[in-house]
Amino acid sequence: MGTKENTGARNTREALILAGLEELNEYGIQHFSTCRVAKACGMSCAAPYKHFKDSHEFIAEILGYINRLYDAEQTVLLEKCKHDSAREQLVQVSMHYIRFLTEHPAFRRIVMQSFQDCDEEYRVLRGQMSIKTYEVVSRYCEEVQMPPDVRKRKTFIVRAIIYSAALFFDNGELEYNEKNMEQVRGLLEREFDLP
């Protein structure tokens, strides 16, 4: 009987996290309402507090959910391209991130929200999505002996390409297809070719 209860609690917790994801997507962190999340799940306003200490822990768990999903996908990708050069791995990771953000628009909206007025824990959780990417970037920069100022500039440009492409695909400004993904790949590769 304990296993059924654990499974039920896990399912309820996951349902709350998924509804919370939609809540964050629509209202942002500053206007997050556990009561709206509970109602979206057909539960009482008190139900989320059986699974999360408070709304802070609830939001942190939603961000952790996004991190775990992306980390699992990125781990598979990096395993597939582990014998490629650091540059190719960086291009692959960048392309995958564009796909991830495009295919999960709610995640993109949450990841791209301003976290300036938020708790440090939220900023740290959002930053955890980039840990493996940062390792690949560091390896590539060491290989090509890239100076810090160039690394900073290129990081900004590559991030701008990634976020712009995901946004353009999501809002229909660019059709989300392989031809356009190849054009984006060309932009990324061109940036790595430039001094």
In which residue ranges do the predicted regions lie?
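Amphipathic alpha-helical packing segments from all-alpha helical-bundle domains
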Residues: 75, 118-145, 152-156, 186-193
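Short secondary-structure transition hinges
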Residues: 99-135, 167
